[in-house]
Swiss-Prot record:
Stored HAMAP family: eIF3j
Job of this protein: Component of the eukaryotic translation initiation factor 3 (eIF-3) complex, which is involved in protein synthesis of a specialized repertoire of mRNAs and, together with other initiation factors, stimulates binding of mRNA and methionyl-tRNAi to the 40S ribosome. The eIF-3 complex specifically targets and initiates translation of a subset of mRNAs involved in cell proliferation.
Protein's name in the database: Eukaryotic translation initiation factor 3 subunit J
Organism: Aspergillus clavatus (strain ATCC 1007 / CBS 513.65 / DSM 816 / NCTC 3887 / NRRL 1 / QM 1276 / 107)
Keyword Methyltransferase: no
Gene Ontology terms, MF aspect: translation initiation factor activity
Transmembrane segments: none
Length: 268
């Protein structure tokens, strides 16, 4: 065979046909099932990622809240309390409620909010144990004429002294209010009981110092009273002497020395 013929035969040779593999009846179903499994795995992963993101955001929020200062938390608490009070007020607008009941309700709401805020601030601290150690209790003074008008003395800065100057200020505020009643019959008995209650939480050494200070005051009072008594006696004696001299000097001799009734023979 000539070379040209060989070339023609090589060019006429066609590539072998591609034989398509026949799919089995269940092969398509397996592909669908694999797709579903992949979709389920993807959904689970998305849920896990969402939960992880939520947990991370919550942790970041808690960390940010812990970093806030006490003043910031108190301010947020006040804003929340005002918001709750306004919401309660709007809800009760249609109800038949007088002004006194409204104020009482708002006060209860505020108190509940304060308690919740205290729990948020102190967390798992045993508040009852702290109270037993002498933590101040709420001292609410209300007006007998208007019970809705009340003041919590324990919340006032004056009654939360910590420094020497603050205690001095508390003293200068209370003493004039209390000693103004010193002339009343029950004041002395009240002062005794008040003093005992006042030093009840102190140790014996501090109580002894206070007792010594009271003894010093008692001795000073005794000296003052004795000096006053001596001065009073001297003044009284001087007044009595002056009165006697004045009475003696001012006595008038009313005897009549006229010659009426006397005869010449009377001198014989």
């Amino acid at each position: 065979m000539t070379p040209s013929k060989w070339d023609d035969e090589e060019e006429s040779v066609s590539p072998p046909p591609v034989v398509n593999r026949r799919k089995f009846d269940d092969e398509e179903d397996e592909e669908v099932l694999d797709s579903w499994d992949a979709a389920e795995d993807s959904e689970v992963e998305r849920e896990k990622a969402a939960k992880a993101a939520e947990a991370k955001a919550k942790a970041e929020a808690e960390a940010a809240a812990k970093k806030k200062s006490k003043a910031q938390r108190i301010e947020e608490h006040k804003a929340e309390r005002r918001k709750n009070a306004e919401a309660d007020s709007e809800e009760d607008e249609d109800e038949d409620e007088d002004e006194a009941e409204k104020r009482a309700r708002l006060r209860r709401t505020e108190k509940d909010s304060d308690l919740k805020h205290a729990e948020d601030l102190f967390g798992d601290i045993d508040l009852n144990r702290s109270r037993n150690r002498g933590a101040p209790k709420a001292i609410v003074i209300s007006d007998s004429a208007d019970p809705t008008q009340a003041v919590d003395l324990s919340a006032m800065p004056l009654f939360k002294p910590t420094t020497k100057d603050q205690f001095a200020r508390l003293t200068t505020t209370l003493i004039p209010l209390l000693t103004a009643h010193s002339k009343k019959p029950h004041y002395a008995l009240w002062a005794q009981e008040f003093t005992k209650q006042l030093v009840k939480e102190l140790n014996s050494g501090d109580v002894k110092k206070i007792a010594s200070a009271l003894t010093t005051v008692s001795n000073e009072k005794m000296r003052e009273e004795r000096a006053a008594d001596k001065g009073s006696k001297k003044s009284k004696a001087a007044k009595t002497k002056v009165s006697l001299v004045a009475n003696r000097d001012n006595k008038i001799d009313a005897t009549s020395y006229d010659d009426d009734g006397l005869e010449d023979d009377d001198f014989m």
